[in-house]
Curated annotation (Swiss-Prot):
<dbReference type="InterPro" id="IPR014710">
    <property type="entry name" value="RmlC-like_jellyroll"/>
</dbReference>
<dbReference type="GO" id="GO:0043565">
    <property type="term" value="F:sequence-specific DNA binding"/>
</dbReference>
<keyword id="KW-0804">Transcription</keyword>
<keyword id="KW-0010">Activator</keyword>
<dbReference type="InterPro" id="IPR018060">
    <property type="entry name" value="HTH_AraC"/>
</dbReference>
<feature type="DNA-binding region" description="H-T-H motif">
    <location>
        <begin position="264"/>
        <end position="287"/>
    </location>
</feature>
<keyword id="KW-0805">Transcription regulation</keyword>
<dbReference type="InterPro" id="IPR009057">
    <property type="entry name" value="Homeodomain-like_sf"/>
</dbReference>
<protein>
    <recommendedName>
        <fullName>HTH-type transcriptional regulator MtrA</fullName>
    </recommendedName>
</protein>
<dbReference type="InterPro" id="IPR020449">
    <property type="entry name" value="Tscrpt_reg_AraC-type_HTH"/>
</dbReference>
<feature type="DNA-binding region" description="H-T-H motif">
    <location>
        <begin position="216"/>
        <end position="237"/>
    </location>
</feature>
<comment type="function">
    <text>Involved in the induction of the mtrCDE-encoded efflux pump. Binds specifically to the mtrCDE promoter region.</text>
</comment>
<feature type="domain" description="HTH araC/xylS-type">
    <location>
        <begin position="196"/>
        <end position="297"/>
    </location>
</feature>
<dbReference type="InterPro" id="IPR011051">
    <property type="entry name" value="RmlC_Cupin_sf"/>
</dbReference>
<dbReference type="InterPro" id="IPR032783">
    <property type="entry name" value="AraC_lig"/>
</dbReference>
<dbReference type="InterPro" id="IPR050204">
    <property type="entry name" value="AraC_XylS_family_regulators"/>
</dbReference>
<dbReference type="Pfam" id="PF12833">
    <property type="entry name" value="HTH_18"/>
</dbReference>
Amino acid sequence: MDILDKLVDLAQLTGSADVQCLLGGQWSVRHETLQCEGLVHIVTAGSGYLCIDGETSPRPVGTGDIVFFPRGLGHVLSHDGKYGESLQPDIRQNGTFMVKQCGNGLDMSLFCARFRYDTHADLMNGLPETVFLNIAHPSLQYVVSMLQLESEKPLTGTVSVVNALPSVLLVLILRAYLEQDKDVELSGVLKGWQDKRLGHLIQKVIDKPEDEWNIDKMVAAANMSRAQLMRRFKSQVGLSPHAFVNHIRLQKGALLLKKTPDSVLEVALSVGFQSETHFGKAFKRQYHVSPGQYRKEGGQK
């Protein structure tokens, strides 16, 4: 597994890509800000306007555009770029897909996907509020074609295909964004990973957070002085090296609490903590609940 695979795993992602919106006439659809959820709009036909909370001017969107809100920022899609009254769509089921129709005719058609994730997911928290891409990217073109094919008529195994597409779609969106020629806007762990001097160390810690990551070992892995390492981590990642290691250990611990029957002590030791008490205190500081309560409530705090 590479670092993107690991971050996807630690994010505890779940998702759906089974909503198709058909918009026509004088339409306006409001999406409120979501907590620990990302949202993707994929415009497959037509055009309209996107009004994003906090921005003063509407953005035109059209066929081929993909708009990704990693943290579910509130926004309005409309026919004229104005904040009109949000219409209640007519909803019907078309096989696996839920079809939402607003207005008469068809000015814009789009697929919508949603992703839930752990509140400390570096994968989503390190991205900008809005990511703009286009279906023209070869890999994205492929997965969008799959959505269109499965929505047109029920095929054998459609449910399995549609259920598998959200995670594929998200990884391809992330890959396409990170591969852009221009400088991408990142923060936190993602920014540190892209840093030429820190990237190797960050990848090693994420790969094996349970190892003994003392400052001397990290200095050697990054090939820089202790002072340089401290400054660069703070400026790029926003954490000290030690805090970063604990941050990743706790995310892995949260994942194991959710996915395995291991005791809290076993989880604590397997992610690099020396005792259940130390792990429990650190976990509660980050997740605001005890490890046992986190497991009981099903995670994604």
